[in-house]
């Protein structure tokens, strides 16, 4: 009986992990659809930061 309980618990845990993984993938794909344009401000900020570090 104990092994059945452990097996069921493991199976449930595996199902939850797969479900969370699928939800994360879905969230990423929805975010990519919602914001397809790359952030220009972020790119400018990276350029600014990298140019500052080379000047020092």
Curated annotation (Swiss-Prot):
InterPro entries: Arc_rbn_hlx_hlx, MazE
Inducing factors: By heat shock and by exposure to sub-MIC concentrations of several antimicrobial agents such as doxycycline, erythromycin and penicillin.
A biological process from GO: regulation of DNA-templated transcription
Keyword Transmembrane helix: no
Keywords, alphabetical: Toxin-antitoxin system
Subunit and interaction comment: Forms a complex with cognate toxin MazF which inhibits the endoribonuclease activity of MazF.
Family stated for the protein in its record: Belongs to the MazE/EndoAI family.
Functional description taken from the UniProt entry: Antitoxin component of a type II toxin-antitoxin (TA) system. Labile antitoxin that binds to cognate MazF toxin and counteracts its endoribonuclease activity.
Stored NCBIfam families: antitoxMazE_Staph
The protein, known as: Antitoxin MazE
Organism: Staphylococcus aureus (strain Newman)
